[in-house]
Amino acid sequence: MAKLTINAAEIHTAEQLHRLLSEELGFPRYYGMNLDALYDCLTDSEAEITVLHPEKFAENLGEQKAESFLRVLYDSAEANPLLTLNIE
């Protein structure tokens, strides 16, 4: 099982976040770097994702992008019993 800790204070762009997830969780080369593709990949992944300082996403990415990203994480974890999400 892949384990990934995302420190939101260190994420400054959506592209950086998608790249981190793709590289660390081994997404396929054709990963689309968007929220729909993220959901698809996460619902097919066995992983534990921990997000530190989630409030920093809103500061760094903007409120709407941060909310959308976190919603995809929650929805993916709900749909996939092999995906564990920890928000700290």
PLM regions: where:
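Positively charged, polar, low-complexity stretches
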Residues: 1-88
